[in-house]
């Protein structure tokens, strides 16, 4: 357990597509399998000590007694039950079971996190457990913060893509993939670090922990995470409240009531002052960004605030449409396209979120009212455990409960605008598990397993069954996803269209037949392979395989507009290569269906336009392009498509007018699309004998993509014709 809590926040592996969250998830799942196996072995020992009949007869009584003595544990089981039911009735049950990509919050994660809760609950009878747990969590926070400081001072030995930025500065993320997640973990760790410092007996150790706490607070502030700052404020308020609560509950004199809270607040005050001094000295480049970010906390018009509001609105509407069980555990991202707004697209441009960025709204959307009730029950029972433990007659338990309560309050505060990831959830579960035992520490007694003497034949059989079950669970939940992720990483090292890339994705898809991304990426690579092929027969075979891959992906995710848009593009290419009478009708059907399923996604609309254009269905393509241009007037692609259709129809003047607009608009990171627009514009100019403009347009295309053959030909032709005219 201690090793898990130490490693989960700091583990990352650069040889995986998801270098941070995926290895943490696999580590947590491995630990959970071991914990479940140990629990199963203990139960098999019970069976061996008596008999199967006696064990089954006693089981109902034991369960009733357990529920009465451990309401918090029963609440956690009830929440797991809600997650299980939402998984069974999910819009995508397999995804809910294993977790969505870039989210990893399925039933597998829920059960693994619950195992941490129950393991910590069982260890709470050991007086050293809280000290061990908080010490390793504080060490992990120090390591994560230390790596973040390297990033802050631009000393990171690794180069990372996809930085979150603000005010022109890269935001630090440490070992937790995103500044918000780093900030959330540090918020939880700070009260624990304060507690470790106050319990230290050596002055040198105490000072060392104070420095660690100050550095942690410094990093927390420089994450520029408003959610983490809110969590810090909530944690601070909870700390003051709980210290005061403990003093009132245990003091008999007014003098002691006055002193106790003040004593408890000395170290946090020292940390705060030291951090402010360090921040002013060491990070002057962040001062303006800090001021601006703080001003955005209450600014409802800030883009990120508007983005959150859009996500919350979508989550509430999702919950209203699936009021009892939700759309399915971890299916927010899959259900989101039906609730996407044009305003959200303008803010985030084409992103498909996997979370609602508010824990309760996310639960409502994915688990319905049943999940919300179960989650609220757990929250209230944890609060009850904190409140009872801070009034304990044991001063050690009281102080530990104050730190735990403040950490969990910080967790709840950041969850108002964020979400839970593996490291944060595991620490919260461990603290809640300890509280579940601490509130009854003075009365609870261990429930020993009676020894049965030498292992019996039945015990050996039970042990073998447990081992086989644990091995099967480990292979299906850890080994296969890990192998598939490694294959995906190897695939990503090859260019799009490479047979090696395609085959690696195909092998990954065979390992995880419920995961549509592998089929999608195999299909995309096959499509590019077909486009690049000069042999019509080879191109046709690649297109057939691409179509099959996208059809497989659509069967896995029947709601996806993106997958259908790619399928329409492949069908359109097949129509061009080997025309059939029914081909264009099939392209039209799939393209229109794709847009109907994700009607405000500009990329889906764009892919549908291109597929319709490829099948020479210009009327339908033009209608979609005009619709996209009205929704997103700054987006270049629909203007380029309208211009390309005009060029193909021989309306060169109209093509020039529209393409000239397109090349000046926003391509949203698509330089190849812009290059093609310049190339088409050069063709239109040539047709109208505007050779100087044609040469300039062709050269603009070649600056973006020197390999465009038509642009090269247009440039040479324009130069030749200009020379002939002169």
Report residues per predicted region.
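C-terminal luminal/periplasmic domains and tails of membrane-associated envelope-modifying transferases
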Residues: 489-726
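Hydrophobic alpha-helical transmembrane segments in integral membrane proteins
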Residues: 281-298, 455-500, 517-521
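Transmembrane alpha-helix boundary signature
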Residues: 39-66, 84-99, 123-128, 156, ...
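Alpha-helical transmembrane segments of multi-pass inner-membrane proteins
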Residues: 1-12, 28-42, 75-90, 105-285, ...
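Membrane-interfacial, low-structure loops and terminal tails that flank and connect transmembrane helices
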Residues: 46-70, 246-262, 389-398, 442-458
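Flexible juxtamembrane loops connecting transmembrane helices in multi-pass membrane enzymes
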Residues: 167, 171-173, 235-236, 255-257, ...
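TM-adjacent membrane-interface loops and short helices in multi-pass inner/ER membrane proteins
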Residues: 178, 309-353, 360, 367-374
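Short, hydrophobic transmembrane alpha-helix segments
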Residues: 11-25, 45
């Amino acid at each position: 357990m201690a090793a898990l809590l130490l490693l989960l926040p700091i583990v990352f592996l650069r040889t995986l597509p998801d270098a941070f969250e995926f290895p943490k998830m696999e580590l947590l799942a491995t630990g959970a399998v071991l914990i479940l196996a140990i629990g199963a072995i203990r139960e098999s020992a019970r069976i061996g000590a008596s008999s199967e009949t006696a064990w089954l007869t006693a089981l109902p009584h034991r369960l009733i007694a357990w529920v009465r003595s451990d309401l918090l544990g029963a609440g956690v089981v009830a929440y797991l039950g809600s997650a299980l039911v939402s998984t069974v009735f999910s819009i995508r049950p397999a995804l809910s079971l294993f977790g969505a990509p870039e989210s990893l919050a399925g039933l597998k994660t829920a059960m693994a996190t619950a195992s941490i809760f129950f393991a910590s609950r069982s260890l709470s009878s050991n007086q050293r457990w809280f000290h061990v747990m908080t010490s390793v969590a504080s060490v992990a926070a120090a390591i994560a913060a230390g790596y973040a400081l390297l990033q802050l001072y631009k000393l990171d030995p690794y180069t990372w893509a996809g930085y979150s930025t603000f005010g022109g500065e890269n935001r630090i993320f440490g070992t937790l993939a995103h500044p918000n997640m780093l900030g959330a973990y540090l918020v939880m760790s700070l009260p624990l670090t304060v507690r470790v410092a106050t319990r230290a007996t050596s002055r040198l150790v105490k000072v060392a922990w104070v420095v660690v706490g100050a550095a942690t607070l410094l990093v927390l502030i420089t994450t520029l995470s408003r959610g983490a700052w809110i969590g810090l404020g909530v944690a601070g308020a909870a700390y003051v409240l709980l210290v005061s609560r403990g003093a009132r509950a245990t003091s008999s004199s007014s003098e002691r009531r006055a002193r106790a809270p003040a004593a408890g607040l000395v170290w946090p005050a020292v940390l705060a002052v030291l951090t402010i001094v360090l921040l002013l000295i060491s990070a002057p480049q962040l001062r303006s960004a800090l001021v601006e970010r703080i001003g955005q906390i209450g600014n409802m018009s800030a883009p990120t605030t508007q983005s959150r509001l859009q996500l919350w609105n979508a989550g509430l509407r999702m919950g209203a449409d699936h009021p009892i069980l939700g759309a399915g555990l971890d299916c927010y991202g899959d259900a989101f396209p039906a609730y996407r707004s044009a305003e959200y697209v303008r803010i985030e441009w084409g992103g498909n979120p996997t979370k609602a960025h508010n824990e309760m709204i996310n639960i409502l959307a994915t688990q319905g009212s049943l999940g919300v009730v179960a989650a609220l029950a757990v929250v209230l029972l944890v609060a009850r455990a904190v409140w009872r433990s801070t009034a304990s007659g044991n001063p050690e338990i009281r102080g530990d409960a104050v730190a735990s309560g403040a950490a969990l309050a910080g967790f709840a505060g950041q969850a108002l605008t964020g979400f839970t990831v593996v490291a944060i959830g595991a620490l919260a579960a461990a603290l809640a598990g300890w509280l579940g035992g601490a509130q009854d520490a003075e009365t609870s007694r261990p429930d020993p397993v009676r020894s049965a003497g030498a292992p019996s034949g039945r015990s050996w059989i039970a042990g073998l069954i447990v081992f086989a079950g644990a091995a099967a669970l480990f292979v299906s939940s850890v080994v296969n996803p890990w192998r598939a992720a490694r294959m995906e990483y190897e695939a990503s090292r090859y260019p799009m269209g490479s047979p090696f890339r395609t085959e690696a994705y195909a092998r990954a898809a065979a390992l995880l037949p419920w995961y549509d991304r592998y089929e999608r990426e195999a299909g995309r690579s096959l499509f590019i392979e077909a486009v690049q092929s000069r042999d019509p027969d080879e191109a046709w075979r690649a297109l057939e395989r691409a179509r099959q891959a996208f059809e497989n992906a659509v069967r896995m995710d029947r709601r996806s507009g993106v997958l259908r848009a790619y399928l329409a593009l492949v069908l359109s290419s097949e129509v061009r290569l080997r025309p059939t009478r029914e081909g264009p009708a099939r392209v039209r059907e799939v393209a229109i269906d794709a847009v109907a399923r994700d009607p405000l996604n500009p990329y889906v609309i764009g892919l549908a336009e291109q597929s319709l254009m490829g099948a020479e269905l210009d009327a339908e393509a033009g209608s979609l392009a005009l619709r996209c241009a009205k929704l997103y007037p700054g987006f270049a692609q629909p203007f380029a498509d309208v211009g390309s259709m005009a060029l193909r129809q021989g309306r060169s003047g109209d093509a020039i007018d529209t393409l000239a607009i397109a090349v000046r608009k926003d391509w949203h990171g698509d330089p190849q699309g812009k290059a093609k627009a310049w190339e088409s514009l050069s063709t239109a100019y040539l047709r109208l004998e505007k050779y100087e403009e044609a040469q300039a347009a062709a050269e603009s295309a070649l600056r973006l993509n020197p390999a465009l053959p038509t642009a090269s030909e247009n440039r040479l032709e324009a130069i030749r014709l200009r020379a002939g005219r002169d």
